[in-house]
From Swiss-Prot:
UniProt record similarity statement: Belongs to the Lgt family.
Pfam families in the record: LGT
Compartments it resides in: Cell inner membrane
Gene name of the record: lgt
Membrane-crossing segments per the record: 27-47, 66-86, 104-124, 130-150, 181-201, 208-228, 242-262
Pathway linked to the protein: Protein modification; lipoprotein biosynthesis (diacylglyceryl transfer)
Matches recorded under HAMAP family: Lgt (MF_01147)
Origin: domain of life: Bacteria
UniProtKB keywords: Cell inner membrane, Cell membrane, Membrane, Transferase, Transmembrane, Transmembrane helix
Name of the protein in its database record: Phosphatidylglycerol--prolipoprotein diacylglyceryl transferase
Species lineage: Bacteria, Pseudomonadati, Pseudomonadota, Gammaproteobacteria, Alteromonadales
Length: 268
């Protein structure tokens, strides 16, 4: 027998309404945004802790700089990636779709590209190597990923494929069929398991770029696994009859992650 979705109100609290220049606004604090905020604060705390233990290699001010540009990279890259990877036809028909943030839509792979761009800038600004920055950031990224998947679950979105497993769940927007709660699988793998893996691995290697490589490898493998039970995007379906867009975008991550881990010591 399928479990019922808990139907948590996605809005925690509403403010207003407010009248500003004849326009009515009713801002709200939503669980989706709140989970990301919690993830951001937790990541900031851990990065500051790492900075305090870095023997002067990092300061808290430099961490704040990194977080600011990293956050911009996630938001801008995530939105642009979502539109280009998953709704390119909408964008061609109406370029303003890119700015319709209120309709939702973020892509991890786009966000990753945005963060990489931010890290390149920080490396240049702080006169570091790129992987010195990336290895600092990689272990805390799963915190934000896990928090975001909890937000997806509360929103009742990005559910899995139809199944008859005992823990299958009926989602309000997923029809009457029981489905995999794939958001929770992603929370467990991309959030908890990946965080523990990176924490363990970062204590056992000093090789520049290896921690970044393990993040790419671990995330890529976990994403490929979960995509086998996650409902493919309706507008894209399956490529070649068996691969989702998420899996296609994860394959280069896996290959490059392996390269970073296995490349000879000292090779930049």
């Amino acid at each position: 027998m399928a479990l019922n979705f808990p139907n948590i109100d996605p809005v925690i609290v509403k403010f207003g309404p407010f009248d500003i220049f004849g326009q009515t606004f009713e801002p709200a604090l939503r669980w989706y945004g709140f989970t990301y905020l919690v993830g951001f604060v937790a990541a900031m705390w851990l990065l500051n802790r790492q900075a305090d233990r870095s023997n002067g290699l990092w300061s808290r001010e430099q961490v704040s700089d990194l977080l600011f540009y990293g956050f911009l990279g996630v938001i801008l890259g995530g939105r642009i990636g979502y539109v280009l990877f998953y709704h390119f036809d909408y964008f061609l028909a109406s370029p303003m779709y890119l700015f319709k943030i209120s309709e939702g839509g973020m892509s991890f792979h786009g966000g990753l590209m945005g963060v990489i761009t931010a890290m390149i800038y920080i490396a240049w600004k702080q006169k570091r190597t790129f992987f010195a920055v990336a290895d600092m950031v990689a272990p805390v990224v799963p915190i934000g990923l896990g928090a975001g998947r909890i937000g997806n679950f509360i929103n009742g979105e990005l559910w899995g494929r139809v199944t008859d497993v005992p823990w299958a769940m009926v989602f309000p927007s997923g029809g009457p069929e029981p489905r995999h709660p794939s958001q929770l699988y992603q929370f467990a793998l991309e959030g908890v398991a990946l965080f523990l893996l990176l924490y363990w691995f970062s204590k056992r290697t000093k090789k520049v770029g290896a921690v970044s490589g393990m993040f790419l490898l671990g995330y890529g493998i976990f994403r490929v696994i979960v995509e086998t039970v996650r409902q493919p995007d309706a507008q894209l379906g399956l490529y070649w009859g068996f691969m989702t867009m998420g899996q296609i975008l994860s394959v280069p991550m896996i290959l490059f992650g392996l390269y970073l881990i296995l490349r000879p010591e000292g090779k930049q």
